[in-house]
Amino acid sequence: MEILVLNLGSSSIKFKLFDMKENKPLASGLAEKIGEEIGQLKIKSHLHHNEQELKEKLVIKDHASGLLMIRENLTKMGIIKDFNQIDAIGHRVVQGGDKFHAPILVNEKVMQEIGKLSILAPLHNPANLAGIEFVQKAHPHIPQIAVFDTAFHATMPSYAYMYALPYELYEKYQIRRYGFHGTSHHYVAKEAAKFLNTAYEEFNAISLHLGNGSSAAAIQKGKSVDTSMGLTPLEGLIMGTRCGDIDPTVVEYIAQCADKSLEEVMKILNYESGLKGICGDNDARNIEARKEKGDKQAKLAFEMCAYRIKKYIGAYMAVLKKVDAIIFTAGLGENYSALRESVCEGLEDLGIALHKPTNDNPGNGLVDLSQPDAKVKVLLIPTDEELEIALQAKEIAEKLK
């Protein structure tokens, strides 16, 4: 079975094609800067007998044009003979709201609901829907499965996902915590349970997906019971350009003091805050280099980021009571050893103790970073959201045969 995974952003398309016999990628790639003056198309073949890479700068007018280019080059490069040989397509859909708690086979009704949920994810859901609509028109016989970023967190109890606002705002406008990165949190939690030889249904963990966008999740008996992101991905941890948790009154105060519109303030919170807001840079490598040279702003940004993560670990340990593992994943979680060290520092009384030499040089793949006698394992697990989407799509596609 061959499954194509599509992840359409506001101006990009990421894809990965899998052979599900061995869960191995056949090809992967990216179309970016869609709608801009000059875009870029990258496609890499992972076939042993046909290793090649395409990199091309060209105009990519819209998402449909990008998908056409990907389809054309998959056959031109000899990765597949015909696009119609693909058994199913799994789509990453960012916002499933209260409607979608699990992956679902796409039909007209599902497409309408994804469209309606665009109000909660105006940058992402319309792009996700554009990919679904393209395939529906061009290849109506290929089953499409929508996999929602929010679905893993659908198991949160109401006391964790509700905001202390007038209840009618939830009833009328569905204002609540949804959480994101669910596919990633789910994938690494399953990998961790497998690695520790623990039944997933009994597994408790704190998963830290740390990238330019970051979130923490409390996982109890294999299910999400709390997460740091909220109605949108703005809440929670300090991120590359997002502020994370702040006093809501700050929005009004900035608007008044700086004479900004609501839209302008939200732009500041989403794109000009976080690490970038504190030190002018959201590239962790630059921040680390500056910090080592004694740059005070870089040091402050780093310390604020680590401190916020540490606070969430403490909160989630109180929620879970028993924790089998702390999981670090995604770009920063997998590659930023100094951040992992700072986050875990001083948590020995909670059973968390890093083995510094392993943390500094973890190598590749899944690694246990903890001291041998540590009560709580600290694991570095590379995430693979595309594979998790493919696995969930496969489960539904197989039932159709």
UniProtKB/Swiss-Prot annotation:
Localization per Swiss-Prot or TrEMBL: Cytoplasm
Residues binding substrate: R92
Major localization class: cytoplasm
Binding annotation for Mg(2+): N7, E385
Entry's Gene Ontology BP terms: acetate metabolic process; acetyl-CoA biosynthetic process
Top-level EC class: transferase
Cellular component, GO, one term: cytoplasm
Matches recorded under Pfam families: Acetate_kinase
Record has Ribosomal protein as a keyword: no
Cofactor note: Mg(2+). Can also accept Mn(2+).
Site (Transition state stabilizer): H181, R242
Active-site residue list: D149
EC number(s) on file: 2.7.2.1
Reactions it catalyzes: acetate + ATP = acetyl phosphate + ADP
Assigned keywords, A-Z: ATP-binding, Cytoplasm, Kinase, Magnesium, Metal-binding, Nucleotide-binding, Transferase
Described purpose of this protein according to its UniProt entry: Catalyzes the formation of acetyl phosphate from acetate and ATP. Can also catalyze the reverse reaction.
Family: Belongs to the acetokinase family.
Subunit composition and interactions: Homodimer.
Name by which UniProt lists this protein: Acetate kinase
Protein's organism: Helicobacter pylori (strain Shi470)
